[in-house]
Regions:
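Catalytic and binding regions of secreted/periplasmic enzymes and modules that target cell-wall glycans
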Residues: 31, 35, 46, 50-61, ...
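Compositionally biased amphipathic helical and low-complexity segments enriched in hydrophobic
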Residues: 2-6, 103-106
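Export/targeting segments at the very N-terminus of extracytoplasmic proteins
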Residues: 3-43
Length: 111
């Protein structure tokens, strides 16, 4: 699937990401997840960051994967989930540890 083309479809995609996160994460991890997305992209599926850097970052989570440039919202969600699990581990509830990822963002002073 590709990115939604209009504002209404983008709004629906964001609602779907939030709903998926809400049913798969604890409340605390859900809050951390949402703060990460807000900090990284302001919930913009088409966000492009690191413009002056060697590699641009794309999507909700600002990942430096060219394949995410046109990836739909669910692909972006699961790619980042996989990244967080492998980089920061899981919680006792087997959630991706978004709070550790958020802590890392804050300690590095990013966003």
């Amino acid at each position: 699937m590709a990115l939604p083309l209009d504002a209404e479809a983008s709004d629906q995609a964001i609602k779907e990401v939030k709903a998926l996160a809400k049913i798969t994460l604890t409340h605390k991890q859900y809050q951390c997840h949402n703060e990460i997305v807000y900090r990284e992209s302001r919930w913009d599926l088409r966000a492009v960051g690191n413009i002056g850097g060697k590699k641009q970052a794309y999507g909700l989570y600002q990942m430096k994967l060219e394949s995410l440039k046109t990836a739909d919202h669910m692909r972006q969600y699961w790619k980042y989930w996989y990244y967080v699990v492998h980089r920061y581990g899981t919680t006792s509830h087997n959630d991706a540890d978004y709070c550790k990822a958020l802590h890392h963002l804050k300690t590095k002073g990013w966003q």
